[in-house]
Amino acid sequence: MENQQHQVLEQELWQGYKDRGFVVTKFSDLVDSVVRWSRSGSLWPMTFGLACCAVEMMHTAASRYDLDRYGVMFRASPRQADVMIVAGTLTNKMAPALRRVYDQMAEPKYVISMGSCANGGGYYHYSYSVVRGCDRIVPVDIYVPGCPPTAEALLYGILCLQQKIIRGNPGVRGA
């Protein structure tokens, strides 16, 4: 379906070029696509490591996986970050802090939920003190499954977020 839409658009652009020698497009669409492309290539995640998933998150920044080559640079301050990676078990006491940090991030902001505990409570799902998924506190864009998920899985989640931003899906806020 998406490929057919792409082919139709390509034919319309080529026909316009053949008829007039140039292509006319809506300037706002062009600017939006350039902005989405640039945002996808310069993600600055803020780590919110709560448990063992945070160790795997650290591996992605090391030389073997090297997130820098994708334009991803970890930030310590929420005011400098546009992506929050929630990694690990979120307790009821930590939930207000998570929300406060999320609110301090500038728009557009995205959230990656990493690991079974962040996705749905994981091993501690039935504990009275555990939030059963960080999506109950903040809106989540990408879920990375696993206990703990591998560094490759997080890398794939980041690449999926980049593609979501480029496509400009309505589910992605601010894109």
Swiss-Prot record:
Recorded topology in the membrane: Peripheral membrane protein
Pfam families according to UniProt: Oxidored_q6
The species this protein was found in: Anaplasma marginale (strain St. Maries)
Lineage, highest ranks first: Bacteria, Pseudomonadati, Pseudomonadota, Alphaproteobacteria, Rickettsiales
Annotated function: NDH-1 shuttles electrons from NADH, via FMN and iron-sulfur (Fe-S) centers, to quinones in the respiratory chain. Couples the redox reaction to proton translocation (for every two electrons transferred, four hydrogen ions are translocated across the cytoplasmic membrane), and thus conserves the redox energy in a proton gradient.
Subunit structure: NDH-1 is composed of 14 different subunits. Subunits NuoB, C, D, E, F, and G constitute the peripheral sector of the complex.
GO molecular function: 4 iron, 4 sulfur cluster binding; iron ion binding; NADH dehydrogenase (ubiquinone) activity; NADH:ubiquinone reductase (non-electrogenic) activity; quinone binding
Name of the protein described by the UniProt record: NADH-quinone oxidoreductase subunit B
Family membership: Belongs to the complex I 20 kDa subunit family.
Keyword NAD: yes
HAMAP family: NDH1_NuoB
GO biological process terms held by the UniProt record: aerobic respiration; electron transport coupled proton transport
Signal sequence bounds: none
Required cofactor(s): [4Fe-4S] cluster
Reaction(s) the record says it catalyses: a quinone + NADH + 5 H(+)(in) = a quinol + NAD(+) + 4 H(+)(out)
Domain of life: Bacteria
